[in-house]
């Protein structure tokens, strides 16, 4: 992703999944929440400071896998982010508390469909298209590694359609649809 043409380290941010330190290790256990895209993010120091050399990728990978940042530090207690002001994170909080009595933020995993975006914005169609294939493969790998019981996408069909088709081998099963007021949710068994 960091080698996509037109990417400027001072103008783009890269997302890596967040996994709580108490995320279940058993197969088919835990919850993986998926958002649309980065929309601004704090990056490991090597993203902005490393020289543009072959070693950049390894420095970034080392920062990601040696990070001790959890959802609690990254989202809930971030000095420049209002967790309580985010309907997105309040919904994740409420759903997680249905499964876990306390400390939900240490027991879930979070990722995005698209991993690369301009700071403070979601990727435009061009940037989405440049990264779509690799992001679909990354999402499948995240699901494989984390082996969650539930994968909950807060994305809408427009954003998730190609990803769902990819994860389902090119043919979507009929979803279970639930409506409440003007809202609806769709559940797929994949």
Predicted regions and their residues:
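Charged, glycine-enriched surface loops/patches
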Residues: 82-99, 163-190
């Amino acid at each position: 992703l960091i080698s996509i043409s037109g990417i400027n380290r001072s103008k783009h941010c890269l997302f890596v999944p967040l996994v709580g330190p108490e995320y279940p290790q058993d197969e088919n256990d835990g919850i993986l929440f998926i958002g649309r895209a980065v929309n601004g993010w704090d990056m490991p120091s090597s993203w902005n400071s490393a020289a543009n050399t072959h070693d950049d990728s390894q420095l970034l990978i080392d920062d990601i896998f040696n990070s001790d940042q959890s959802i609690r530090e990254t989202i809930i207690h971030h000095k420049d982010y209002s967790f309580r002001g985010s309907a997105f994170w309040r919904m994740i909080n409420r759903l997680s508390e249905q499964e876990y009595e306390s400390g939900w933020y240490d027991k879930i995993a979070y990722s995005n469909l698209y991993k690369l975006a301009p700071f403070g914005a979601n990727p435009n169609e061009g940037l989405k298209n440049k990264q779509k294939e690799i992001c679909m493969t990354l999402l499948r790998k995240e699901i494989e590694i984390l082996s969650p019981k539930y994968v909950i996408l807060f994305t809408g069909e427009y954003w998730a359609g190609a990803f769902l088709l990819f994860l389902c081998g090119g043919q979507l099963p009929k979803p279970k649809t639930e409506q409440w007021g003007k809202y609806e949710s769709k559940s797929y068994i994949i």
